[in-house]
Regions:
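Beta-strand-rich modules
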Residues: 612-634
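A short beta-strand element within beta-rich, extracytoplasmic domains
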Residues: 247-271
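Short alpha-beta junction capping motif
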Residues: 648-652, 656-665, 675-683, 734-792, ...
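Aromatic-Pro/Gly-enriched surface loop or interdomain linker
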Residues: 181, 186, 194, 352, ...
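Active-site-adjacent mobile loop/cap segments within catalytic or ligand-binding domains
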Residues: 235-239, 320-334, 339-348, 407, ...
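A glycine-rich, often tryptophan-bearing local segment used as a flexible ligand/cofactor-contacting loop or short
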Residues: 747-844, 856-858, 864-866, 904
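Pro/Thr/Ser/Gly-rich low-complexity, intrinsically disordered linker/stalk tracts
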Residues: 538-581, 632-655
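Catalytic-core regions of hydrolytic enzymes
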Residues: 129, 135-143, 147-203, 207-218, ...
Length: 913
């Protein structure tokens, strides 16, 4: 094989000057060389004085190339005016040199009043958006399709039909949500072109709303671009930036229901904006500080993150005029206070057949954008003369160009990533990233971006630890450009940034569908996309070559109470490597009194353990841990909880019992998916009333599983420590140190490392030593005594369930959510209750196991359905009033409400006394 050592020198004039390319080891350079002449090319780019990127040696894929073609990375060329776009779009997208002119002073209260009415959490350590590899970057995140209005049929429809439990319109959104949170944790400013997270409530506060108060010195703007109504007297307010705070605008909504709320802000961009406008979100648990560069992005909703707010008006968002940069304290730079949004709401854009009424995030992008851009934006940005279906294609890139202020920063400081899934007769598999067929309609470096993401996703899914289904399919071709895609058109996006569509898998293929329904795979796809974008940044700019990836979440947290009432928390590092992420260099531990809202956190200085004071002495303390590195901050670990022995007057009062809470859910898998029934045709009327599955790992992680058992034990005056099942199996904590163990596996199939043979041996020894055990879960009995393609129990599994515990699997309950006590049984005082929880992120409790008692065991709860239908079995003693164990064939956290669970726990503990 020949090796060429020639260099070819090219120059091309672009907006930034003359850029020179030195290309060595060049394949297919148009001189009749064989495609087999070389296997790699080394590319160096410079301006003559500054290296734009380090020399990169890239493998050359000759598939489909003629002997005289090669795709080279070239700098942005001088564009033709508007790239052929209509003049209205060119004008709408063009960055202007807008600056505020002195305006009428706004009526405002003294700044001291803002301090007097601020959240008490202002005095506690604040939380911050992490800094990381995407700090300073603006990412426009998109998810294809969604509920769309059909003018001819006058109905709303999904653009893709149901198949294998998946509707692409919703799966794309779930994928974007995961990606958005990874971006936020990596320091990015995220502009979602469909809403982030699931929150049907909404509160939108404009600067003129009664719930908005101004403090200090503000002025009225005369801008013609703003959020609100066409007749608003004051478009918005602005204040001069200063090193010390002299102006605050406070947006205090009435939150109708406690929950996790995405928070968005709307501010016009401009030349005189500060580079880091400060927003303080006072939510339950902490005050979080976020900075947005409104010289770079504006005129639409920018996502600040998602935060837990309690019902009422205790939470708020402040806009502050304080800046760190002394250059911006010059009397010329300003901060802007226009609108703040809490939650997503439901569809309310009018159409001839009415408003959709669907959860707004499930609608197509054009409706969110229409409600986002303000009264003076050109409606052609989000509409189409043809149909709403057409509008969903053009809206995202046009909106990105409209919101982006391209004169601030460089081409690589922003990017648009859109998520879809693919279909091709059920036969194709794998990830494909897209770029446009027409070279004239490709934003600069688009093919490179597509190739890097497509390669990364496929490679990581192949190499990731095996899932419980067929392996990821290796693809020869990881990109596709068979047509010119509207979402990616250069004229729509005005070449202000690069853009690609990531078709993460083929939803019409049964094997790929298994990946799409698995949150672990969805997380891998999002993380691989993140790394692919970073690779693209690094290929184009030398300063980006060292960018890292945020770590994975810490594993196996354990919370123990110490004799002096303090709390010891320990954990293990998350997996690190090219696939998972870079190693953590520090950890941050967060505490909560509720398990929902956490404080600002504290660094452990790299240690894998910490000792904390309890939040209160009479209620549980909840803890979670994150890992940090130069790439950002990981997702949080599992939540663990502890209730120390209660402290009295200088002496320790020991509660009547001590327990260990074990979270058996250690893996994200398809059992954590949420079912969704839509009483409306999807893309196909035959799908009416069918179930689609939503993959929402963040909702799953935040679900109140640990809280349910912790609150019930607290009501029974039982102190406890907690961990997950892997911590037990790996010897981090001993069962025999606790007289009572409550082991919960939720809806997860416990075959994947939860009740392994060694763990079963530990439980058997614990019971022989006189320990008391409560096992609960929807599929635990089926996994250990049933027979299905997904779960084939071993002989050890069956012996454990049948001989040690004295019960057997009898079938599956798919009908009844009502559970009743067996008359005369040990739980006869428990009131009849209903299995609930799907709306809380706990997942649908059905189907759940039906069990039967063996030997000296006895049935104590039954599903309210005809036939043999035991929902709980108790046993372990010849005394029918006391025993060693209780088995609940449903998740404890799904048992009715808080009062019901407290009564159920009290009766169970009475039996296990």
């Amino acid at each position: 094989m020949r090796k060429l050592n020639h260099s070819y020198y090219f120059t091309q004039r672009c907006a930034g000057g003359v850029v020179a390319f030195t290309i060595a080891h060049l394949l297919n350079c148009g001189v009749g060389l064989s495609q087999q002449a070389l296997t790699s090319a080394t590319i160096t780019m410079s301006t003559g004085t500054e290296s734009l990127a380090p020399a990169v040696t890239m493998p050359i894929n000759t598939e489909g190339l003629s002997a005289t073609t090669i795709s080279l990375v070239t700098p942005p060329s001088v564009p033709a005016p508007g790239f052929g776009a209509p003049q209205w779009l060119v004008d709408a997208a063009r960055a202007d040199k807008f600056v505020e002119i002195p305006g009428k002073p706004l009526r405002a209260s003294p700044l001291a009043e803002a301090q007097r009415t601020q959240s008490p959490l202002m005095s506690a350590p604040h939380a911050f958006q992490p800094t990381g590899s995407f700090s300073g970057k603006v990412v426009f995140a998109m998810a294809g399709h969604g509920w769309t209005y059909n003018d001819d049929k006058q109905i709303y429809y999904t653009q893709r039909a149901l198949g294998h439990g998946i509707v692409e319109d919703f799966g794309n959104l779930d994928q974007m949500h995961i990606f958005a949170h990874l971006l936020w944790n990596s320091g990015a400013t995220v502009v979602p072109l469909r809403p982030v997270d699931h929150q049907p409530n909404e509160r939108i506060l404009d600067n003129t709303s009664a719930q908005v108060k101004f403090y200090g010195e503000w002025q009225e703007s005369s801008s013609k671009v703003y959020f609100g109504g066409k007749r608003d007297r004051v478009p918005y307010a602005f204040a001069t930036a200063q090193r010390s705070e002299t102006a605050v605008a406070r947006y205090r909504p009435w939150i109708p229901e406690s929950g996790d709320y995405p928070v968005y802000v709307w501010a016009r961009d401009g030349e005189d904006r500060v580079s880091a406008q400060l927003y303080r979100i006072a939510h339950a648990g902490a005050v979080t500080e976020i900075h947005v560069n409104h010289r770079r992005v504006g005129k639409g909703w920018v996502w600040l993150g998602s935060f837990w707010f309690e019902k009422g008006d205790t939470g708020y968002v402040d806009v502050s005029n304080v800046v760190d940069d002394p250059y911006e304290d010059d009397g010329k730079h300003v901060v802007v206070a226009d609108a703040v949004r809490f939650g997503n709401g439901v569809g309310d854009v009018p159409r001839p057949a009415g408003r959709s009424g669907f959860i707004r995030e499930d609608e197509a992008d054009c409706y969110w954008i229409e409600r986002s851009l303000g009264p003076t934006a050109d409606r052609r940005i989000y509409s189409s003369n043809v149909s709403d279906g057409n509008a969903t294609i053009a809206s995202p890139p046009r909106t990105a160009a409209y919101m982006n202020r391209e004169t601030e920063g460089s081409f690589t400081d922003r990017v648009l990533v859109s998520f879809h899934s693919n279909a091709f007769r059920g036969q194709s598999r794998g990830c494909v990233a897209l770029f446009n067929e027409s070279p004239e309609q490709r934003p600069d470096y688009q093919e490179l971006l597509a190739r890097m993401i497509g390669t990364q996703v496929n490679q990581e899914l192949i190499e990731d630890p095996p899932f419980s289904y067929p392996k990821w399919a290796a693809r020869d071709r990881v990109t596709y450009n068979g047509i010119t895609f509207g979402e990616l058109r250069k004229d729509y996006i005005q070449n202000e940034m690069c853009a690609t569509i990531v078709e993460v898998a083929f939803h019409d293929n049964a094997e790929d569908a298994m990946f799409l329904l698995d949150p672990r795979a969805r997380m891998d796809m999002a993380r691989a996309t993140l790394r692919g974008v970073l690779n693209w940044f690094a290929a184009l700019r030398a300063k980006n070559s060292a960018l890292g990836v945020l770590p994975t979440a810490p594993e196996n947290p354990v919370a123990r109470s110490l004799p002096d009432g303090r709390i010891q928390v320990s954990w293990q590092p998350g997996h690190a490597g090219r696939i998972e992420g870079d190693p953590a260099t520090d950890y941050r531990i967060y505490r909560s009194a509720t398990g929902y809202s956490f404080d600002g956190g504290q660094s452990t200085q790299g240690e894998l353990a910490a000792v904390l004071d309890p939040v209160t002495s009479s209620s549980p303390t909840y803890v979670r841990v994150t890992g940090l590195n130069a790439g950002g901050e990981s997702w949080p670990s599992q939540v663990v909880s502890v209730l120390p022995a209660l402290a009295g007057d200088g002496a320790t009062t020991v509660p009547m019992r001590r327990a260990l809470l074990i979270a058996g859910i250690t893996n994200l898998d398809a059992t954590s998916d949420e079912s969704q029934v839509i009483d409306n045709p999807f893309g196909n009327p035959a799908d009416h009333g069918q179930i689609t599955w939503r993959v929402r790992p963040r909702t799953h992680l935040n679900a109140p599983r640990m809280q349910a058992a912790a609150e019930a034990l607290t009501s029974c005056a039982v102190s406890f420590d907690s961990c997950n099942s892997r911590s037990v199996g790996e010897g981090q904590i001993r069962l025999n140190d606790y007289p009572l163990v409550i082991w919960s596996v939720g809806r997860q199939n416990p075959r994947n490392g939860i009740l392994t043979t060694p763990t079963q041996a530990l439980i058997a020894d614990y019971l022989r030593q006189g320990g008391k055990l409560v096992l609960n879960g929807a599929h635990l009995a089926a996994a250990m005594d049933g027979a299905s393609p997904q779960s084939v129990p071993s002989n050890e599994d069956r012996l454990f369930l049948r001989q040690l515990l004295g019960l057997a699997y009898r079938g599956m309950n798919v009908q009844s959510r009502v559970v009743s006590p067996v008359p005369g049984g040990v739980l006869q005082n428990v009131p009849e209750f209903t299995l609930t929880g799907n709306e809380q992120g706990l997942g649908d409790p059905l189907p759940s196991d039906v069990v039967g008692a063996l030997g000296g065991s006895g049935e104590v709860l039954r599903y309210k359905v005809a036939g043999a239908s035991a929902a709980a079995v108790a046993g372990g003693s010849t005394n029918r009033r006391t025993g060693n164990w209780m088995f609940l064939a449903f998740p404890f956290e799904n048992a009715g409400d808080e009062i019901t669970r407290a009564e159920l726990m009290r009766s169970v503990l009475e039996y296990l006394r």
